[in-house]
């Protein structure tokens, strides 16, 4: 099994409008690796960074990012670290949470609550009845 860095996924997924020769070679190599049938491993942080790059750098809409991530995770040869937490995070993301906030909550399900000063995430998580509950610490 080969663990993949985020840049491999970005090259395989994103079609640059005017790619240079190096980008074209990297895209071909990334696509060849992903279509080889060999098992590949994605860490939680790679998935988190991929969401950020697609949304923040390439300015893809949330729905596009969600579709890309769900399609990627459905590929049989891809083994995902903490896959259940990633799927839960994608559901929170679909419902309007920031992906990182949704991922924090999904990975903290075993906790009684999560402390955060992010009032927007707190309000949305509460409205969606997500677990664990988010609490804003008081002085």
For each feature predicted by the language model, list its residue ranges.
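Alpha-helix/helix-capping structural signal
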Residues: 7-8, 45, 119-120
């Amino acid at each position: 099994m080969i663990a993949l860095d985020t840049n491999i996924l970005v090259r395989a997924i994103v079609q640059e409008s005017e790619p240079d020769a190096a980008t074209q070679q990297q895209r071909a190599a990334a696509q060849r690796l992903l279509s080889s049938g060999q098992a590949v491993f994605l860490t939680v942080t790679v998935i988190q960074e991929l969401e950020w790059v697609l949304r923040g750098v390439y300015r893809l809409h949330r729905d596009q990012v969600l579709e890309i991530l769900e399609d990627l995770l459905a590929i049989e040869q891809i083994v995902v670290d903490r896959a259940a937490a990633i799927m839960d995070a994608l559901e929170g993301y679909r419902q309007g949470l920031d992906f990182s906030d949704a991922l924090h909550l999904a990975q903290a399900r075993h906790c009684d609550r999560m402390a955060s000063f992010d009032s927007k995430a707190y309000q949305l998580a509460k409205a969606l009845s997500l677990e664990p509950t988010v609490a804003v610490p008081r002085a």
